[in-house]
A protein has these predicted regions:
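Helix-loop "lid/cap" segments that line or gate small-molecule binding pockets
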Residues: 42-51
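Short alpha-helix in the alpha/beta-hydrolase fold that links the catalytic acid
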Residues: 74, 99-105
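Conserved strand-to-loop "acid loop" that flanks and positions the catalytic carboxylate
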Residues: 85-94, 118
């Protein structure tokens, strides 16, 4: 299950995928002295979850879990999506991963189903019902 997420191929890194079409919110991201990557708190709402209420975005901004920046350069050796059934959700209004990039990853994965939602990167929070429906569909098909 991929929810507006990266899906690298063998020998490919997240950073390489990010070069296909840079994120519109790239300028709102910063690295800290420990090598973690954060979305600037004052830019979080407009960058990550513009379809959520301001108060929810603020909570997400101050509790965000920053990835270590080195993950962007690590290559994948054996992507699970080549061996396992997959489903992909594209966020049409994503500012973190461009929707064009999400579609390109989904197309090459040949998922059992791809859905598109009018949502930000935070589709799990803004469209939980649609995400649950996709998960239930996926679970039912492999049970």
């Amino acid at each position: 299950m991929y929810v507006a997420g990266f899906a690298p191929d063998a020998g490919e890194s997240i950073g390489q995928i990010g070069e296909w079409l840079p994120s519109p919110a790239l300028g709102n991201v910063e690295w800290d002295s420990d090598g973690y990557v954060w979305i600037k708190q004052d830019k979080f709402h407009e960058s990550f979850c513009q379809d959520l209420p301001t108060d929810e975005a603020l909570v997400m901004a101050v509790t965000q879990k920053a990835p270590v920046g080195s993950i962007f350069g690590e290559t994948i050796s054996d992507p699970a999506w080549k061996k396992k059934p997959t489903w992909y959700q594209v966020s049409r209004d994503d500012r973190m991963i461009p929707p064009v990039t999400e579609r390109r990853m989904a197309e090459r994965m040949k998922p059992r189903r791809t859905i598109e939602l009018d949502s930000s990167h935070a589709s799990l929070a803004s469209q939980p019902g649609a995400i649950v429906d996709l998960i239930v569909e996926a679970a039912a098909s492999i049970s």
